[in-house]
Design a protein with these regions (language model features):
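Conserved active-site alpha-helix within GNAT-family acetyltransferase domains
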Residues: 104-118, 244-262
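A conserved beta-strand-loop-helix scaffold within acyl/acetyltransferase catalytic domains
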Residues: 166-213
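Conserved acetyl-CoA-binding loop-helix of GNAT-fold acetyltransferases
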Residues: 78-88, 216-232, 250-251, 255
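A short helix-loop-beta-strand connector motif used in the catalytic cores of GNAT acetyltransferases and
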Residues: 34-52, 67-71, 175-185, 204
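Glycine-rich acetyl-CoA-binding "A-motif" of GNAT/NAT acetyltransferases
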Residues: 51-52, 192-194, 248
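Conserved glycine-rich acetyl-CoA-binding loop
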Residues: 207-222, 234, 244-247
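Short amphipathic alpha-helix that is part of the acyltransferase structural core
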Residues: 1-26, 125-126, 133-169
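Acyl-donor-binding surface of acyltransferase catalytic domains
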Residues: 41-42, 48-145, 149, 267-269
Length: 278
């Protein structure tokens, strides 16, 4: 039903996914980075080759912390997707997992979960916002501000402020992001981060946060602009997912030149959430 791609096939799949942008953005972005950076092990599976209809990026679940690293999925054929979810062993529906994919697959996930008798819910629904031309970023004044990158000593701080964090199993995800992908932060006079933004394994930028006592100083604008330029220079796509309820972040990214694709929404589905959040 599904088989794993080789290193050479991953490069071919990256080029193939460009044809389906923006719908394939997250899986495409993941392969762009995966083909250039070696981080945590991930299996990339397809239903057939080379004309695949379903492609999935699935982290290894060797440790409990690995379960918090989302699987990513892109499909051009809903019927094939439903068959794979229902009949293959790609996902163990008796355990916790989270999948990021198109919101258009909502009914498929609900139906398969219902048939298997397990709880499944959508935990996020987001706008896809991309920056097509980095050179058109508006100028930002960072004079007198210390901008750096996050390091491993900052994992706990990021985890405690991320809305999906505050649990031990999120630490592995954040550690992987800080160790392997670009990040930016503003440091105070004592060298401690007061505002930061990270890059996910898919290339999406996010986890943007500023400590309450440092808000209103323009730090978020500086960090989004800085990380966008850094990722672009590395050849990564520059984009972000903004929750539909997050009007503040939407305005920030829009004012920096990011544009929303009105035809597409990304969603995250969680199965057996009680195993992580009892």
């Amino acid at each position: 039903m599904a088989f794993e791609l080789s290193e050479d096939q991953l490069k071919t799949a990256e080029n193939e996914l460009k044809k389906y942008l923006p719908m394939s953005q997250q899986v495409y972005g993941f392969l762009v980075i995966r083909n250039r950076v070696r981080s945590d092990p991930v299996r990339v599976l397809v239903d057939r080759w080379p004309q695949f209809r379903v492609i999935m990026c699935k982290p290894h679940g060797e440790q409990k912390s690995d379960l918090f690293k989302d699987a990513l999925l892109f499909a051009t054929d809903a019927a094939v997707l439903e068959e794979i979810l229902s009949k293959s062993s790609v996902f163990d529906w008796s355990k916790y997992f989270c999948v990021g994919t198109s919101v258009s697959h909502t009914e498929i996930f609900k139906a398969v979960a219902s048939a298997k008798g397990v709880p499944c819910k959508r935990v996020a629904k987001c706008y896809l916002m991309t920056l097509e031309d980095v050179s058109r970023l508006p100028p930002v004044d960072s004079s007198g501000i210390s901008v750096s990158s996050l390091d491993e000593s900052h994992i706990g701080l990021v985890n405690q402020t991320w809305k999906f964090g505050k649990v031990d199993v999120a630490v592995g995800l954040i550690r992987n992001m800080i160790a392997n992908f670009p990040s930016c932060c503003v440091l105070d006079a004592e060298g401690k981060p007061v505002s930061w933004i990270l890059t996910y394994a898919s290339g999406a930028i996010g986890m943007l946060y500023t400590l309450p006592e440092h808000r209103g100083k323009g730090y978020a604008k500086i960090l989004v602009s800085s990380l966008a330029k850094r990722n672009h220079a590395l050849g990564y796509p520059v984009y972000s997912f903004i929750g539909e309820e997050n009007a503040v972040s939407y305005r920030l990214f829009a004012n920096l030149g990011f544009t929303e694709d009105p035809s597409y929404r990304e969603a995250w589905f969680v199965v057996n959430e009680f195993q992580i959040f009892p």
